[in-house]
Amino acid sequence: MRTKRRTPGRRGWRWVVWALVGVLVSAAGIAGVVVWQNTYALREETVSLRHDGKVLKGVLARPETGGGPFGLVVFVHGDGPVDATHETFYRPLWESFARAGYASLSFDKPGTGGSEGDWLDQSMADRADETLAAVAWARGRPDIDGRRIGLWGASQAGWVLPKVAARDRRLQFVIAVSPAVNWLRQGRYNLLAELRRDGATAQERQAALRRRQTTLDLLERGASFAEYRAEVGDVDGMTPARWSFIAENYRSDATADLCAMRGTPVLLVLAGHDINVDVAETEAVYREILPARSLTVAHYPAAAHSLVDHDLERSRWRLTLTAIVAPRKLYTGRFLAEQASFVQRLDTGEEVRRPDTGDGAARPDTGTGADRPGTCKGTVRPGTCKGTS
């Protein structure tokens, strides 16, 4: 017996069509939200700078409206092969500064993006020279107010920012995000913090410290990468270029340069869940050396080293989704708003140490930091500057 195939009636087809329309509209809506959330109130211009015989490529991000001259925030990267936008991570910051009337300038690290050279060939002094060249280049532009140029830097930039500010006393400010003071102490702190996080046993901890000491002994005697590899066996991702970079920079300490830059307004940004940097030591040294009247310290208790919320950073899928759908929400609490308010207060001549409200809890330095010329006391760490005017 033959059966008649049933086909959807007009109402059935109509339901299918409307269901498809709904799916398409939803998809278009989501796509629209993603596009909107990744669109910033900025005018970005690709720029280039010749420095030390090499061309550096970068981005100048100006406020969306106005002809300037604008203030300028020059970005100084942390460790690694960072491009000008830090894979777009900087753009929310640029937008916040733009709302305060400041442009942002950032270059691809040498050997990254469009820049020539190799960042692993650089010392911290080389990085400071590069930053000074960027500042000088910016002062030559009619759309930039040369009196309103400051620095923003994170992590490893903590050894670069003070060098630059010590040599260019015209800088309006320095914003130091999660900086360390001493390379060796920072390395030990980071190692032990990661071992605690990973639940290492006492034996594993001692083995890691022995390996670290072996590495330091090799660095002290100027050993080659081949000698390092022969001594430790598993190089754990170390490359010859990275070994050379560490050998060049492992003695870095910001203390003397912090003394030399005293008087420049500084915003010190510290995270509550930082396992890379000993924020207690950093804060103590900054408060000891820098005048109270020029230092603002902002604590973000929920943040990790990157100023992303610690809980968000621990969830890869949430972190990825947030980066795509709501990139401004990557940063903790009121971090973005308080970056902008710091430079705005400098522009208006308002007291820069006034506490902010919100999660950042920026507050003035109330310690006994060196307020008077000639007093840069050495009570925090051996070697802290003394008698620096």
In which residue ranges do the predicted regions lie?
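Short beta-strand element of the alpha/beta-hydrolase
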Residues: 69-78
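Alpha/beta-hydrolase active-site loop
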Residues: 121-142
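N-terminal cap/lid segment of alpha/beta-hydrolase-fold proteins
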Residues: 33-68
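Accessory cap/linker subdomain of secreted extracellular hydrolases
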Residues: 175-260
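The serine-hydrolase catalytic nucleophile loop
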Residues: 82-93, 109, 280
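Short beta-strand/loop motif that positions the catalytic acidic residue
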Residues: 261, 268-270
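Short alpha-helix in the alpha/beta-hydrolase fold that links the catalytic acid
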Residues: 277-288
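Conserved alpha/beta-hydrolase
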Residues: 94-114
